[in-house]
Amino acid sequence: MALLEQKTTAAQKVDERIKPVSLLTQLMRRPELGAVAGLILVLVFFFLTADPTMFSLAGLMTIMAPASQLGILAIAAALLMIGGEFDLSIGSMVAFAGLVFGVLLTNFGQQLAVAIVLTMLFAAFMGAINGQIVIHTRLPSFIVTLAFLFILRGLTLVGLKWATGGSTQLRGIGEHVKDSASLAIFSGDALKDAFVWLADQDLIDKFPNGMPKVSGIPVSVLWFAALALLATWVLLRTRMGNWIFAAGGDPNAARNSGVPVHRVKTGLFALTACAAALVAIITVLDAGSTDARRGFQKEFEAIIAAVIGGCLLTGGYGSAIGAFFGAIIFGSVSIGLTYTKFDSDWFQVFLGSMLLLAVLFNNFIRRKVTGER
Amino acid sequence: MANTKGPIIQVTDIVKHYGSVIALNGVSMHVSAGEVLCLLGDNGAGKSTLIKTLSGVVRPSSGQFLVEGEPVNFTSPRAALDAGIATVYQDLAMIPLMSITRNFFMGREPLKGFIPFRHVDFKHCNEVTREEMHKIGIDVRDPNQAVGTLSGGERQCVAIARAVYFGAKVLILDEPTSALGVAQTSMVLKYIHQVRQKGLGVIFITHNVRHAYAVADRFTILNRGQTLGTYAKSDITMDELQNLMAGGKELQQLSEGLGGTI
């Protein structure tokens, strides 16, 4: 908000002839407005109904852990949606990348760093294939990636049975990576020393022995926040960002203006698959095993989070920071309901309603912003 | 018009085949700086193929294509753009959901900073956009507003202003007024007049003889892939032009049949 106000004053300095744009208009023009409003609504709801422990540090971390894993997918899905395409295969991609990662570690005995790099490269390659098929066949990405949803899920099952000799779960990954130097970047909690220090200063809750009750921030949360910032910067401040909006807004107009639409879209598909691989790596390392149901239905949750975050289904409009808030709404509701007296099965009802509201709201805002009739 | 130099674009006997279809069968035309050439022709006359050839989308099968006296052979729209030939398509010019600034600089964003932190200088972009819009008399309150909030005529003007700003020597306007109302049309025609005074060559494609007659210096009429003739404005009346364009006789007969209402 402060940033917006600064912008307004800067513009006034530049040219006094220009009437200042009202703060309300500026806010309305931000695609993430709905998500921020939604998050405030959700938090107020839980303030009134939930057990106060939900808002303790431990409670927040419980919410942020699943929110961050979904959020990494949602941010990538948001960029792809702004670029005008969908990827319904990300959930299956999480499972398949988990399988590739696990097999590289256990069956092939690769180093953790090598396995991570190879898994990422492999995911990028699969994403690029998705993109190439969509571009060259001109089929809707919805249908092409729906095919890959099943293909990758099936390959994961087949591959797991092949790798384990008949089981659908690949265990023992933890032992292979115990001593790896890069483990701390992808697994466990970060900033542990800072939390110990905070506990020493009596700033956060601690156990009787002086150790903090929350040992640190899950690394996935840091990845999530870093990706949200990076994606927002790319979208709003870089040439690539302008190209993503243009490719999704109108590929023909973009191409006529010299935007390499095919390269942008292929890159976005590869990025989405890499985000799925990152989630696979983080969750597989945390669990020490991988199974066929990993990432199940995450594609829908990611797209819902992106839509709640202000992305239009038709592309060309949306925000990464909106998807960030969308994912946090998701995490707050799914975990938060367990802190209330409500049955946590209300979650899905709540989610569907939220999605419907978000779409209606986005349409309304888009008409307002663009003067479309 | 004081044209000491030769024409900016000169094409001679351009032929274009699509397989067995002959789209252009020896078309010749030229346009000089500070001149509006109007390209007239009915559907299928070869107007779009000629535009596509000039703007580098398709390559001619044979014929001579000179830009400022030098023979050229464009391999992409980008190459034509770099040579100073900018094309504004009637409906594919702007992206309504994006801001005016983002549209204005689309594909040619000015960059600032070193590689990992390289970004678009949007502050500069906004200033340029506001300035350029001001020049053509469109009051842009905020260059961050979406192009969708502009009228059709304003959008065409923004697209033309963009081409002018990025150093076009020749503007090709593909039916810029065909989807516009009266007030919007006069706005665009007025701007075309301004662009000519700046010393750019303009190739103006239209169906509408009235619009053509309002701004053009010369008229080239295409029919069935061939040049039917080029006329200076002083040599031809609007009625004659109308007849030539629609295949002469038939329309005249039809016009008589309908009591002269066409």
Predicted segments, located by residue:
Chain B
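Glycine-rich phosphate-binding loops of nucleotide-dependent enzymes
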Residues: 2-262
